[in-house]
């Protein structure tokens, strides 16, 4: 078996494409993570088939190989390769902190968002602040759900420039039962966002203000209420 693997690895650079493809198949059949490094040059191959197989190898063995293998993908010039690396950040677990922070600075929004999701496991305030202050709307939306996000930052997110971030922040505020004044809900009611959840929250925490709030409801709000009922 060891001889077969060594022979296959040496044939990955063979000039004959059929020989190279057989070598790739042999390596997969032996299912040995130690051969992963041999696939690294294939990430730059002109033939898309070899690039695809190299990515398959990293998906299979990248987590076992560790952060350095995932870093190989994240630092690649090819966008598809970097996105494949971003998909491995969450499976890396606690070993993925530094790489996930690095990936937040990638120029691609998809890589950034996948990095943000991987960072939710790290309950550190500085990580939460990196997310909530990010230029990418999707990253900020994810950051709203970070458990280490300070309450002041969460409240500030209620006034974020983007609707998705504001709505996500409101969802967390309502779920956590945080104290809010009635005026804070008005922009969301006007946009018909989280109408039912707002009414439930007010009924539970500020029942005296429920009449005032319901007086502001319009016919467009009633569909959300009726759907809930």
Feature roles, as predicted:
Residues 1-12, 17:
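N-terminal leader/linker segments that initiate helical-solenoid repeat arrays
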């Amino acid at each position: 078996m060891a001889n077969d693997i060594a022979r296959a690895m040496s044939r990955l650079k063979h000039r004959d494409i059929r020989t190279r493809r057989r070598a790739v198949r042999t390596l997969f059949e032996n299912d040995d993570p130690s051969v992963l490094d041999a696939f690294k040059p294939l990430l730059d191959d002109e033939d898309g088939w070899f690039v695809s197989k190299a990515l398959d190898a990293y998906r299979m063995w990248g987590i076992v190989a560790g952060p350095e293998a995932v870093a190989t993908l994240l630092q690649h010039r090819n966008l598809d390769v970097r996105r494949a690396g971003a998909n491995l950040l969450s499976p890396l677990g606690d070993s993925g902190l530094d790489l996930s922070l690095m990936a937040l600075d990638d120029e691609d929004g998809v890589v950034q968002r996948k990095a943000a999701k991987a960072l939710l496991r790290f309950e550190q305030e500085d990580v939460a602040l990196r997310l909530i202050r990010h230029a990418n709307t999707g990253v900020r939306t994810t950051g709203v759900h970070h458990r280490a996000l300070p309450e002041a930052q969460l409240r500030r997110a209620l006034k974020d420039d983007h609707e998705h971030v504001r709505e996500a922040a409101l969802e967390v505020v309502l779920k956590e039962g945080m104290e809010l004044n009635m005026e804070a809900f008005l922009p969301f009611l006007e946009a018909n966002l989280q109408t039912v959840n707002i009414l439930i929250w007010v009924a539970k925490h500020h029942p005296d203000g429920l009449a005032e709030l319901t007086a502001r409801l319009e016919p467009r709000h009633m569909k959300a209420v009726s759907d809930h009922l």
